[in-house]
């Protein structure tokens, strides 16, 4: 119902970042790569669950696909925020590594759920996403992002396995040739939890532990699986 109301089929296929109900301010006129990716995932999931028919799913995916091809990008990577009315990046223009990783994962899902012609257009977006430009080869880690206003890479890095950035790491190795040794560089500090062991994240949030499971579930008795339950 949320997407039926706030992403109408007659629009540009971009979901709002949020909707404020009290006090009522309506839908935010901005969106991000993660918002777009989760909307694509929701369309495919709704079709799988029988909430919408295949025709509506295809129509929604095509609408978003058309807009994605038209958005200004940095080496094929979306900026972190766009005005949903003008389709221009919001300033300061910044490219977020983790958000681009989330979008790439969702594009792969949308591609697999689409007919051949649409799948090819999704693939062209995937091929253009130069995630390797956000990778620090010396550290073997992804930078937080890239400041397009200053034309400068971020100085901080994603360096923990228990992080939402795990999606970025996985799809970048699979699709963009990032070396597998990058996975070994991700830190695995542990805490004792109820007689077992759980990975530390930066802030202990459900977002960090659970979001990667949308794309890459882990077996129950692995360190990642135990950490998510702990």
Locations of the language-model features?
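Extended ligand-binding clefts on enzyme/binding-domain cores
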Residues: 83, 87-100, 106, 116-230
């Amino acid at each position: 119902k949320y997407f039926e109301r706030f992403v109408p089929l007659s629009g540009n296929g971009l979901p709002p970042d949020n909707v404020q109900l009290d006090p009522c301010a309506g839908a935010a006129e901005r969106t991000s790569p993660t918002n777009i990716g989760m909307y694509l995932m929701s369309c495919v999931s709704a079709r799988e669950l029988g909430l919408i028919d295949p025709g509506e799913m295809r129509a929604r995916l095509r609408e978003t696909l058309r807009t994605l091809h038209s958005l200004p990008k940095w080496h094929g990577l979306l900026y972190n925020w766009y005005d949903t009315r003008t389709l221009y990046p919001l300033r300061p223009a910044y490219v977020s590594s983790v958000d681009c990783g989330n979008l790439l994962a969702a594009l792969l899902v949308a591609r697999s759920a689409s007919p051949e012609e649409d799948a090819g257009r999704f693939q062209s977006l995937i091929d253009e996403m130069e995630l390797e430009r956000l990778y620090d080869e010396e550290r073997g880690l992804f930078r937080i992002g890239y400041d397009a206003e200053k034309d400068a890479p971020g100085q901080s890095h994603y360096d923990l396995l228990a992080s939402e950035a795990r999606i970025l790491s996985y799809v970048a190795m699979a699709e963009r040739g990032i070396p597998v040794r990058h996975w070994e560089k991700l830190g695995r500090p542990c805490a004792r939890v109820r007689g077992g062991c759980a990975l530390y994240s930066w802030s202990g949030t459900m977002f960090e532990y659970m979001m990667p499971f949308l794309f890459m579930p882990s077996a129950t008795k692995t360190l990642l699986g135990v950490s998510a339950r702990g």
